[in-house]
């Protein structure tokens, strides 16, 4: 039996998580195994109840489970709190306390939605790649950092173990995905830290002789992702470059409501849609649950090692979309849109009994 901690959070978080949990219930019923779900408050919802965005009880529950499912955090109600009490600080803390060092962001275009992309349909059709972004090092955390009246400074630094563990994760994923290709993204032509990154990735690659490794400069990668996204399978890169490239890749799909993510550590993992809490549509039952449901698909693949069930969920999403179901964010002008609940029910219907 697996144990999931559900932290729905704020805004549309509870609505999209409810849809994802309904999918989990259908999967366990269909395949005859059990998943225990334990819900805890997080973010603004937790602050309103307990005066803390992340209570010790919630954190301990997240430590004592197989996977964490997060909805969304934040909203205007809590924007004026001190930085250390803001929802974003709680999210950084939970990632740090769980030892999450890799962010996984898939860029998958469903056939039924090729026309929703801002790129031409023939460019994006068949796109299916994964960005592995290192989360704990690089310029976001390097010291020294600061600014005065005359200058500002930051330090981009990577330790050997930080590069090794993210590279190893990417190579292992490439082996499982079948095409066995990894593209390492850096700026080794001008940055010494990128030269170090490249050397370490190539050193780790010696343990994976069946995987093809290529290198690409980050500026070229940004261009290639929108020019020919199908050329990529697994991308591995540092914190700053990954932050930028994963957002570029994400827009290929046509809506933030389609984009799942996973943050992975040696023991723990947290799964969440990349969209925000969208307080303007919260409680209206119109949010797109697909990103959260696709995050559950990632959970089955990476935490539970059930790639077949992950594929089932993606196929059910594709089936619902092919049927013509669209929430408002992915509906074409004049096209009828469905509710959060209706989209969830459509996906469950395509999962089968």
Swiss-Prot record:
A GO term for molecular function: magnesium ion binding
SUPFAM superfamilies recorded: Isocitrate/Isopropylmalate dehydrogenase-like
Which transformation does this protein catalyse, written as a reaction?
(2R,3S)-3-isopropylmalate + NAD(+) = 4-methyl-2-oxopentanoate + CO2 + NADH
Q: Which UniProt keywords apply?
A: Amino-acid biosynthesis, Branched-chain amino acid biosynthesis, Cytoplasm, Leucine biosynthesis, Magnesium, Manganese, Metal-binding, NAD, Oxidoreductase
Q: Where is this site: Important for catalysis?
A: 140, 187
EC number(s) stated in the UniProt entry for this protein: 1.1.1.85
Q: Write down the superkingdom of origin.
A: Bacteria
Q: Which GO terms describe its cellular component?
A: cytosol
Keyword check for Magnesium, yes or no. yes
Residue intervals passing through the bilayer: none
Q: Where does substrate bind?
A: 95, 105, 133, 219
Q: Which Pfam families match?
A: Iso_dh
* Binding annotation for NAD(+): 75-88, 276-288
Pathway recorded for this protein: Amino-acid biosynthesis; L-leucine biosynthesis; L-leucine from 3-methyl-2-oxobutanoate: step 3/4
One Gene Ontology BP term is: L-leucine biosynthetic process
How is its cofactor bound, per UniProt? Binds 1 Mg(2+) or Mn(2+) ion per subunit.
Q: Where does Mg(2+) bind?
A: 219, 243, 247
Q: Give the main location.
A: cytoplasm
Bridged cysteine pairs (disulfide): none
Q: Which cofactors is this protein said to need?
A: Mg(2+); Mn(2+)
Q: What does this protein do?
A: Catalyzes the oxidation of 3-carboxy-2-hydroxy-4-methylpentanoate (3-isopropylmalate) to 3-carboxy-4-methyl-2-oxopentanoate. The product decarboxylates to 4-methyl-2 oxopentanoate.
**How is the quaternary structure described?**
Homodimer.
Entry similarity comment: Belongs to the isocitrate and isopropylmalate dehydrogenases family. LeuB type 1 subfamily.
- In its UniProt entry, what is this protein called? 3-isopropylmalate dehydrogenase
Organism lineage string: Bacteria, Pseudomonadati, Chlorobiota, Chlorobiia, Chlorobiales
The encoding gene: leuB
């Amino acid at each position: 039996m697996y144990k999931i901690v559900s932290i729905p959070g704020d805004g549309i978080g509870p609505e999209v998580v409810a849809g994802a949990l309904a999918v989990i219930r259908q999967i366990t019923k269909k395949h005859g195994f059990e998943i225990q779900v334990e819900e805890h408050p997080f973010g603004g919802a937790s602050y309103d109840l307990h005066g803390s965005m992340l209570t010790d009880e919630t954190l301990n529950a997240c430590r004592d489970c197989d996977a964490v499912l997060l909805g969304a955090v934040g909203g205007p109600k809590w924007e004026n709190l001190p930085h250390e009490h803001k929802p974003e600080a709680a999210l950084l803390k939970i990632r740090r306390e769980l030892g999450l060092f890799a962010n996984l962001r898939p860029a998958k275009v469903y056939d039924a939605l090729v026309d929703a992309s801002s790129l031409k349909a023939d460019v994006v059709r068949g796109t299916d790649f994964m960005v592995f972004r290192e989360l704990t090092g690089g310029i976001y955390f390097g010291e020294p950092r600061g600014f005065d009246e005359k200058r500002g400074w930051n330090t981009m630094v990577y330790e050997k173990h930080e590069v090794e563990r993210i590279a190893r994760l990417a190579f292992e994923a490439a082996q499982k995905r079948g095409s066995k290709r990894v593209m390492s993204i850096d700026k080794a032509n001008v940055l010494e830290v990128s030269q170090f990154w490249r050397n370490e990735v190539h050193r780790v690659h010696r343990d994976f002789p069946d995987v093809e490794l290529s290198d690409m400069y980050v500026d070229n990668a940004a261009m290639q992702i929108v020019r020919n996204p199908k050329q990529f399978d697994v991308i591995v890169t540092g914190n700053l470059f990954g932050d930028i490239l994963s957002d570029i890749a994400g827009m290929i799909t046509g809506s933030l409501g389609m984009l799942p993510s996973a943050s992975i550590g040696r023991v723990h993992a947290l799964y969440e849609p990349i969209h925000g809490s969208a307080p303007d549509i919260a409680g209206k039952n119109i949010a797109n649950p697909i990103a959260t449901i696709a995050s559950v698909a990632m959970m089955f693949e990476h935490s539970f090692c059930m790639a077949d069930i992950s594929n089932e969920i993606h196929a059910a999403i594709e089936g619902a979309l092919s049927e013509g179901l669209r929430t408002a964010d992915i509906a074409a002008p004049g096209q009828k849109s469905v509710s959060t609940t209706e989209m969830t029910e459509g996906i469950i219907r395509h999962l089968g009994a």
